[in-house]
Amino acid sequence: MLGWVVTFLVVALIAGILGFGGIAGASIEIAKIIFFIAVVLFLVSAVIGLARGRTRV
């Protein structure tokens, strides 16, 4: 699951760079939404991993 979170985070960062750079002005809101979803998924994965006793995050 952490692999998916990292993948979505990278996609969100790329979309954010393109959107905020003026290349694709309409994608700014989509990039923000995807970025925050990726952050939430990362935090959920980290909490679940810590709750299960895994030391890797």
From Swiss-Prot:
The keyword Transmembrane applies. Keywords: Cell membrane, Membrane, Transmembrane, Transmembrane helix. GO terms for cellular component: plasma membrane. It is found in: Cell membrane. Belongs to the UPF0391 family. It comes from Rhodopseudomonas palustris (strain BisA53). This is UPF0391 membrane protein RPE_2138. The chain crosses the membrane at residues 4-24, 30-50. The lineage of its organism: Bacteria, Pseudomonadati, Pseudomonadota, Alphaproteobacteria, Hyphomicrobiales.
